[in-house]
Amino acid sequence: MMINTQEDKLVSAHDAEEFHRFFVGHDSDLQQEVTTLLTREAHLLDIQAYNAWLEHCVAPEIKYQVISREFRSTSERRYQLNDAVNIYNENYQHLKVRVEHQMDPQNWANSPKIRFTRFVTNVTAAKDKIVPDLLHVRSNLILHRARRGNQVDVFYATREDKWKRIEGGGIQLVERLVDYPERILQTHNLMTFL
């Protein structure tokens, strides 16, 4: 099945390519493996085992990016303005600093302790056509963050990941692009890992 972006004008070329990648060469075993992987990653982040997450899930060459897109009317698209703005654009060292900040006993945001619940859904996975150990993974995320009785935030996002198989049988995250749909944050902050 192919998507004709000339007929389906609301579908971007990127989205059509992603659809083709994930649904034409569907592999049920890979799908199950990746779903289990993302579930384990979500569990580590939910229980705030950030050092374990960095050590076991994140590759040293990670590119971790959270963007927000500006939604324009069709008539405004002719100006070719960049529609994506970085909220985070980080590497391994930046993530490590954020983890250290979370672990700091002086971090007032963790008193009382924050509770997280992540729902990772609509998981699709495909092997890279050129690099056999590279996996393309797309998922949707709902993150519920609760602190005290009255501070509750809910985040929704779409994630496009690249995971690579490493020696010893593990799989590590090498790239994560989080498409966060809110242009203006409706929460206190976005100090979390999506």
Curated annotation (Swiss-Prot):
It comes from the Bacteria. GO terms for molecular function: dioxygenase activity. The keyword Oxidoreductase applies. It holds the Pfam family Ring_hydroxyl_B. GO terms for cellular component: catalytic complex. The naphthalene dioxygenase (NDO) multicomponent enzyme system is composed of an electron transfer component and a dioxygenase component (iron sulfur protein (ISP)). The electron transfer component is composed of a ferredoxin reductase (NagAa) and a ferredoxin (NagAb), and the dioxygenase component is formed by a large alpha subunit (NagAc) and a small beta subunit (NagAd). Component of the naphthalene dioxygenase (NDO) multicomponent enzyme system which catalyzes the incorporation of both atoms of molecular oxygen into naphthalene to form cis-(1R,2S)-dihydroxy-1,2-dihydronaphthalene. Also able to use styrene as substrate. The beta subunit seems to have a structural role in the holoenzyme. Belongs to the bacterial ring-hydroxylating dioxygenase beta subunit family. This is Naphthalene 1,2-dioxygenase system, small oxygenase component. It comes from Ralstonia sp.
